[in-house]
Amino acid sequence: MTKVLVLWADTRSANFGVQVLARGLAELATRAWGPETVVEFQNYMPGDSPVSFTTRSIARDVGRRSGPIKTKLREYDIILDSGAGDSFTDIYGLKRHAFMVYASRSAAKLGIPVALGPQTIGPFTTAVGRRGGRYCLDRASVVQSRDDVSAEYSATLGRPVDARATDVVFALPRTEVPTSRDVVVNVSGLLWFSDRHGDSAGYRNSVRSLLGELRSAGRQVSLLAHVVDAVSVDDDAAAIRDLDSESRSGLEVVVPRTLDEVRNTVGSAEWVVGARMHACLNALSMGTPAIPWAYSRKFVPLMSDLGWDLSVDLAHEQNPGEVTAQVITTRKGADVGDQVKGVHDLADERLDAAVASLQTVGTR
């Protein structure tokens, strides 16, 4: 029986995208190493695991044979590193990057193989970040990208990927859900409250514009939170409350409590619009066309690799709301349905390649 630890993912996370990573990678692990495989999860902070892999634990682990991190890692035959989807980079700060490098270094010292599951690789904007990135790539038994831009970037760091995969959301079961909603709009607290990833005022105005355009076109709108955490400044539910209080729109608001509820909600829609990438990926994986509002490099390459060309670049599009509403009101359902099916076919092919490369772990 193989015991696998998935790093940087958690089935209890307030961010349903992180829950997707956990469940999707567990599915890949059992496909690769058999249904009896035991899969457990370790995020930065305690969640599914009682241990943290952050500063305090590292301080107690350095120089010790049986520190908290090494003790945890020793329980497993394989480490499956999710990179938190898009966090194998230094753009979120060197501190988070250091956590990942330390875990990789510790596993290497213990002789435990590390597989980098499908993820965005880079960019690394500092010399320290690039050294850490190369270190992790060089020591990984398997490296998988979830988009071709990441694959090419990994090659520039001296480590060609073993599989050009896609996001693990497409490994989750696809259940048919009756259509009961028109347009589901995910409002991102990350962009609503902070300028870290763009102009928050501009984003808020774009959301208001989108809702106005859709109402004018006679479309019914539901608002969806995809990160639900009352103590987080990134909380989507708080952003929706803010929006609703100013507009008094009376729109349906969905604040899900489980990942299945998220997937059922997006699966019930005619269209989904969102700046949380996994809100859109959940929709596409459930067969619902989605229009991502892209604020970083991670969006477009992944979508393009799957043949999905409907996205709006928030950094360059002057009228995201108007453009999005126009797509929704003019695209024909049958054509979009065929395009979604093509996405599924390509995703299945890429995830089959990911499973095949994982099966080589321990055989090299």
Which residues does each PLM region occupy?
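Active-site anion-handling motifs in enzyme catalytic cores
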Residues: 1-364
